[in-house]
C-alpha cells in the first residue's frame, strides 16, 4: 500500500502533491494519505479527492487525519 505523509507540507503545496500521488499510484489502490491532526489539511485533501471523483474513507477517532483512497 502506497502512503503519502503530508507532515511538514505547506497548505499551498497539497493540491498538486495529492493529485500527482493518486494518479501516479492508481494501480496500487488502496492508497493512504496522512494529514496529521490539521482539520485544514484534511479539508484540502478531500477537496482534491472530490474534484477527481475519488472514493475515500476518512479516519475517525484515533485515526483522524488518515484518509484511505479506495477508488480513483
For every predicted segment, state its role.
Residues 1-72:
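Long, charged, low-complexity intrinsically disordered regions
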Amino acid at each position: 500500500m502506497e502512503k503519502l505523509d503530508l507532515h511538514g507540507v505547506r497548505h499551498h503545496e497539497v493540491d498538486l502533491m495529492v493529485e500527482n500521488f493518486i494518479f501516479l499510484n492508481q494501480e496500487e489502490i488502496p492508497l493512504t494519505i496522512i494529514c496529521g491532526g490539521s482539520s485544514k489539511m484534511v479539508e484540502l485533501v478531500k477537496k482534491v479527492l472530490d474534484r477527481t471523483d475519488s472514493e475515500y474513507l476518512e479516519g475517525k477517532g484515533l485515526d483522524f487525519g488518515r484518509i484511505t483512497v479506495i477508488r480513483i
